[in-house]
Amino acid sequence: MVDELLSAIGPDLVEFERRLEESVAADGPLADAMEHIVRAGGKRFRPALVLLAAALGTPDRDQAFNLAMGIEFIHTATLVHDDLIDHASTRRGITTIHETVGVNPAIIIGDYYFAKGANLMASIGEPSIDLAISNTVMTICLGELLQLTSRRDYDQSLEEYHNKIARKTAALVETCCYCGAVVANLDAPRTEALRQYGFLIGMAFQIADDVLDYTSTAAELGKPVGADLRQGTVTLPLMLALQEPSVAPALRALVAHEPMTDADHEEVVRLVCASSAIEHAEAQAHDFAVRARAQLAAFDDSPSRDTLERVCDYVVERRS
């Protein structure tokens, strides 16, 4: 589905992969640890958004690729550190870096790729891009702290949840689209439209991701179902289910167990899926996607705009 969706920039994505692998291979002792993560692929959602946004204007080709690689390295660095914090053993169906090389080397590898991503983006020579990515990394860190400090907080508000995912996920997606617009030399109104598109589609993406943690399968996700729940991360489906009288008492009793057993986790997933919480969470994701699509009215018809419109459907319909 992803290959078909991104066919408008298919050749660019092939070139992106070539440059990405070449860049990692040049990293000496860090290369072996990173290559298996890079070659595992993933959706390449963020660099694809960079290239799609850039294609709406007249970008310098090398700058667009450096921007896309910089974003992907920074995103990968956040995953390396997230997996450490969450004690995750797999990512995209393969062993995580800290399980492969150890905790201390994994911390250094994550730090290195934060710096490498920033270095690639600085090579573009555009101060607004440098400012955007530094602000974004700080925002992601704040989002991660919010997630850590709200673990097992089953009474957090919708506003608190939205603030958390805005920082942890939507901020980087917003930056992908904003920086893509900058290298595309778009005017201020269209740059702002793409920035708003990125934020809104990032919100939709994360809510859909939180739904998939309850409704997908381990094979589809590349990680165990209910992984967030097992780590104490309270997401929208559980928050909404806890407001339903038909399942709330049973859910409250289960999440009060310390520690929760595997059977407890499985029963929470079952109850959440049996409630209307999934439907309501999906409706929220859809609402953000609709608002994102509206931002594209600022652009004339083109293959890239058409793809960005279809991304709005993809983020809420995907299974992994």
What are these regions (language model features)?
Residues 31-70, 158-201, 237-242, 286-320:
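Alpha-helical phosphate/pyrophosphate-handling elements in metalloenzyme active cores
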Residues 13, 17, 27, 74, ...:
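Hydrophobic faces of stable alpha-helices that mediate helix-helix packing
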Residues 117:
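Conserved ATP-binding module of the ATP-grasp superfamily
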Residues 1-76, 80, 84-99, 135, ...:
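Conserved N-terminal diphosphate/IPP-binding helix and adjacent helical/loop segment
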